[in-house]
C-alpha cells in the first residue's frame, strides 16, 4: 500500500484541497480519491486557527470512519476539542476559539451532528498508526522507540505533545527536547506538531508540519517514495511560530 501523509491542517481547507489535487487526488465526488488507490493519513490537528475546521472534521470523518479509506492520529488540538465536546472545563484559546465560533454559529441539529462525528472520529482512532508491516508509523508529535506498541498515559502525553521538559518558553508554550536526534529505530516515524520551515528528516523520522496555518506551507510525505510535496499557505506569515525544537 502507498500512503500520502498530510501535515497539520488546522482548518486550512483550501490548502488541503490544493495539496491533494497536486498529489493526484480527484475531488469530483466531493472527497479526495486517488486513481491508484493511494491512502491518505493525517498526523492530527485538523482543526483550530484556520477558517474551515468543521468542514475538515466532516471530510476526515467521511474518509476515516464512514468509508474507511484513510488514517487519522489525533493531535493535542484534537484532544482539547474532544474534551470541549464532552463538556469538560477547557480554556477556549490557542486556536480552539475559532473552531468554537464556527460551531456556535450552527443551528443546534448541525452542532449535534458535528459533535457526534468528531467524538466518534477521536474515540475510534488509535494514538498512532503502525503501517506497512511496521515499516511506517504515523503520529502527531513523534514517539520514542521504546514506546512503540504501548498505549499508556505516558505514551499518550508524548504522541500528543512531544518530549516536553515541563519548562515553558516566554510565550507560555512548552519547551520540548529533540527526541528525533536520539531515535535509533528503523521504522519511519512521520509526525507534525512543531512547525518547521522545511520538512525535517532526522534519522528515520520526518516532521511534515510546515506551518500552513502560520503562513508557511501544507506538506505531505509520499510513502514509500519518501518524497515531500507542498503547497503555499494563503494565510499571513508568522515567523515567530517557527521555533527551534529546544
From Swiss-Prot:
Q: Name one GO molecular function term.
A: nickel cation binding
Endpoints of the signal sequence: none
Highest taxon of the lineage: Bacteria
> Catalysed reaction per UniProt?
P(1),P(4)-bis(5'-guanosyl) tetraphosphate + H2O = GMP + GTP + 2 H(+)
Q: What is this protein called?
A: Bis(5'-nucleosyl)-tetraphosphatase PrpE [asymmetrical]
EC annotation from Swiss-Prot or TrEMBL: 3.6.1.17
Q: Which SUPFAM superfamilies match?
A: Metallo-dependent phosphatases
Q: Which cofactor does it need?
A: Ni(2+)
- Family that this chain belongs to: Belongs to the PrpE family.
Query: Top EC class per UniProt?
Result: hydrolase
Q: Which UniProt keywords apply?
A: Hydrolase, Nickel
Known function: Asymmetrically hydrolyzes Ap4p to yield AMP and ATP.
Task: Give the PANTHER family listed for this entry.
Answer: BIS(5'-NUCLEOSYL)-TETRAPHOSPHATASE PRPE [ASYMMETRICAL] (PTHR42850:SF7), METALLOPHOSPHOESTERASE (PTHR42850)
Q: What is the species of this protein?
A: Bacillus cereus (strain AH820)
GO-annotated cellular components: cytoplasm
